[in-house]
Amino acid sequence: MAFVQEPLPYDFNALEQYGMKGETFEYHYGKHHKAYVDNLNKLTDGTELADKSLEEVIQIAFKDASKAGIFNNAAQVWNHTFFWNSLKPAGGGAPTGEFAAKINQDFGSFDKLKEEFSNAAATQFGSGWAWLIDDGGTLKVTKTPNAENPLAHGQKALLTLDVWEHAYYIDFRNARPAFIKNYLDNLVNWDFAAANYAKA
């Protein structure tokens, strides 16, 4: 059973007016994400991992140093699909309802969450990801290097931001802080995060 690249939840140009060009998706989704899927299929073809779910492959390979290449590609396939869903046209704003109340409880305020998330994304050295997670019933912000993700650590991801340079270089060049601000102001999909929280 081959691993597949999930379709984008919007078209390539849907986020143009919100700070993310169609060209970004042509490269990021059309080339980078696709390459991870293709590499994962090559690395797992004919192995016992070929029939596992993507999540199972991530968890198995993370614990086995000999499967580092499989882990990196599997995690990046999962991370990118999760990232596309963490974005939406006319995103931003603020969460509502039970999820908003939980944010206030665990962070003190929504502004404090945004501050912690922005800091995590800005201070991740080199390539990686910033995450909002549910860690045993407590909401936390974390960051991971390269392909690593909360799933590998037994945590529930609610939302992510890709801070690899290829995620923002077409739109923001080397200005990662501007990319982070635009994500929180115009792109972040709090409905997706709330739905993940409800399932946690």
From Swiss-Prot:
Q: Which organism is it from?
A: Nostoc sp. (strain PCC 7120 / SAG 25.82 / UTEX 2576)
Cofactor(s), names only, from the UniProt record: Fe cation
Write the Enzyme Commission number(s) for this entry. Answer: 1.15.1.1
Q: Which UniProt keywords are given for this protein, alphabetically ordered? A: Iron, Metal-binding, Oxidoreductase
Classification from the root reads: Bacteria, Bacillati, Cyanobacteriota, Cyanophyceae, Nostocales
So what family is this one in? Answer: Belongs to the iron/manganese superoxide dismutase family.
InterPro entries associated with the record: Mn/Fe_SOD, Mn/Fe_SOD_BS, Mn/Fe_SOD_C, Mn/Fe_SOD_N, Mn/Fe_SOD_N_sf, SOD_C_sf
Q: What is this protein called?
A: Superoxide dismutase [Fe]
Q: What is the reaction catalyzed?
A: 2 superoxide + 2 H(+) = H2O2 + O2
Cofactor note (record): Binds 1 Fe cation per subunit.
Gene giving rise to this polypeptide: sodB
